[in-house]
Amino acid sequence: MYLTREEERILAGEEGEARAKALEVIVKVGEAVGAERLIPIKHAHVSGASYMTIGDAGLRFLARLAESGARFSVPTTVNPVSYDVEEPGAIPMTRLSPRIVKAQSEILKALEAMGADLILTCTPYYTEVPRRVGLREGDSVAWGESSAVAYANSVLGIHTNREGGPLALMAGIAGRTYFYGAHDPEWRKPRVAYRLETPKVLDETEAGVLGEVIATQHRDEHPPLLDAPLGGEAALKEFSAAVGSAGSLAMVHITGVTPGDPGDMIEEVVTMDYGDLARRMEDLAPGFEPDILYVGCPHASIEELRRLYRALSKAGERAGRRTVVSISRSLYLQALREGLVEKLKGLGVRFVRDSCLIVSPFSSGARGVRVATNSYKAYFYLSKKGVEVGLAPIEALPKLVS
């Protein structure tokens, strides 16, 4: 692999052993996939920060890194953790042991020592981070959160491979990643197109199910091209989360949304019918009265909070008291300033910052609990943990509670 003089200096340990080791990892992975050079990144986002996800082994790894003097060389942010840092008991039906609290606290301490910005969200694109870092279309980053990776490539035109948590961590320390995959303009040109014949604009749950279909069908190494009407930011967010959870796609070129020229390399066109999508929606619809109405996977946007308030205002108190919203601390503060938090709490809604039902102890101890959500990703992961999950858009959720 070709290295610049600066990269050779880093690898030789002139900027510390920790940064040299991090760059060595990036180089070895790059060589394994055939990358010919490295590129600088402007930002890293580390996934796998929850103790429920990485356990004691992950804690020891991060603690050793911090003790070795490892420091992030580019702005680096962090995914959600096991609980709301300021209100640990915020997640309902969840037993949070002192051991989990202590271990999670040590993980955060190690990441903070390395210079991480503890925004603790899976939606860094909703925070002030892109503006603060100066991220623009075409910039390269190293993100580890699958839903954010798909959103960055497909909606924002920011370039990132789907990095594992440790690799995003190493990229943040090294300040480099390998030139391959989503960083290569040629790779970003689709060869297979999917066209959905539909009489309507898709809401976020339909978009999520469409994401499942695309992710499980697509086999080409290049990203697919999608021609389908996705209705607004929630639909784009849930679609991105679905293609990242049901499969391993890092990007879908969405007609009319994704920046940049998709090129003219299409070799195959797959036509899909809305009826097939509707039948899958029926399979996933709640056939029960839920114990929890859940919004915010990935973390909720301000627009979703507004929609939720309008929907709950028309429903009874019972629906509000069963509603849980997970959200980034950054957007929670914005919603607080707009009066949305007070309005929703007045209806009984519970907020969970810094965390979510998936990466908290809830997902391992909620067997038998019934959850209705607008998120395909929440359905995908919670149903694997023995939770009964049904899918419905925000406007339909309160109507499920009698």
Curated annotation (Swiss-Prot):
It catalyses: (R)-5-phosphomevalonate = (2E)-3-methyl-5-phosphooxypent-2-enoate + H2O. The keyword 4Fe-4S applies. (R)-5-phosphomevalonate binds at G48, A49, S50, N79, P80, E145, S146, K377. [4Fe-4S] cluster binds at C122, C297, C356. GO terms for biological process: isoprenoid biosynthetic process. Thermostable. Treatment at 90 degrees Celsius causes a loss of most activity, and treatment at 100 degrees Celsius results in complete inactivation. Binds 1 [4Fe-4S] cluster per subunit. Belongs to the AcnX type II large subunit family. Component of a hydro-lyase that catalyzes the dehydration of mevalonate 5-phosphate (MVA5P) to form trans-anhydromevalonate 5-phosphate (tAHMP). Involved in the archaeal mevalonate (MVA) pathway, which provides fundamental precursors for isoprenoid biosynthesis, such as isopentenyl diphosphate (IPP) and dimethylallyl diphosphate (DMAPP). This is Phosphomevalonate dehydratase large subunit. It comes from Aeropyrum pernix (strain ATCC 700893 / DSM 11879 / JCM 9820 / NBRC 100138 / K1). The lineage of its organism: Archaea, Thermoproteota, Thermoprotei, Desulfurococcales, Desulfurococcaceae.
